[in-house]
A protein has these predicted regions:
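Short, basic, alpha-helical segments at the C-terminal edge of helix-turn-helix-like DNA-binding modules
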Residues: 49-60
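Short helix-to-turn junction characteristic of helix-turn-helix DNA-binding domains
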Residues: 13-17, 56
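A cross-family signal for key residues in well-ordered alpha-helices
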Residues: 11, 24, 54
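Regulatory hinge/linker segments at domain boundaries
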Residues: 1-8, 12
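Short C-terminal boundary/hinge segments that cap the last helix of small helical domains
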Residues: 62-64
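Recognition helix of helix-turn-helix DNA-binding domains
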Residues: 18-51
């Protein structure tokens, strides 16, 4: 259900990257990154970013 970019974003966050590192790695602004995170949170019904990462991992949406 996650877009490829939302998936990449949550994967990097799960691996311990900071938001700045994720944005740099994906060649996007931190504002754009925030939009991807918020969209993923909404789709997953997560309360925060950590919860979104946890849900994505537990549902098998991202592999570590």
């Amino acid at each position: 259900v996650l877009s490829p970019r939302e998936n990449e974003t949550l994967t990097f966050l799960a691996l311990g990257y900071s938001r700045a590192q994720v944005a740099h790695t994906l060649c996007i602004s931190e504002n754009t990154l925030r939009v991807y995170i918020e969209s993923a949170r909404y789709k997953l019904g997560a309360a925060n970013t950590t919860h979104a990462v946890s849900l994505a991992v537990s549902r098998g949406l991202i592999l570590l």
